Amino acid sequence: VLKEFLESEGHNVEMREDSRALTDGTLRGKDALVFNTLREGEMVLSADEQESMKTFISDGKGFICIHISGCVPDSWSEYADITGGGWVMGESFHPPYGKFQVDIQDSNHICAGGLESFETEDELYMNIEYRDQGNDVFVSADFDGGTFGKNREGAEDMHMPGGTFPLAWTRNYGNGKVFVTLLGHDGKSHQSAGFQKLVLNGIDWVTG
């Protein structure tokens, strides 16, 4: 779905499912790198791949980080310097997948053009690692709080606090631009017109 709507807006997209693309020359001539997958555990980037990614972005290219791809690996905490934060295994959580309203909290943000608050079906990430310094948040969601049962036998119910939770921000890494959204769990959430406009705005900014 992601590739389809990006191409429908005129973007030339090369999709790879292996991280060797970071070191095999694939990035040569590209304007931006998009992550849409977990990079923790067995899928963590090698040291060479990490360095190649850092160089690509810091030299002035763009990086778009979607949903779980912002997960901060235990073995590479520096990743959060690039993204400004994201999911942390064993610490972050979310209410059950479902509908909620996404709010544009800063309509003057460079990536907010043409965006209005919208309803989506997705995961609302909470208790993420978050770097206040350098992050320019412009999308969020409110949650009233609640208690939910875990999806495995013997697990205790979990209370999730109410509050306002960041869902998209921009930042810089070296000379490069970084756009992060915590939305985008699955194909259904990617079909949301609001989500698509959000990502397209982010790509236009990081490549501009």
Regions found by a protein language model. Give the residues of each.
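C-terminal alpha-helix
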Residues: 201-208
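Catalytic beta-strand/loop cores that center a nucleophilic Ser/Cys/Thr
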Residues: 7, 91-174
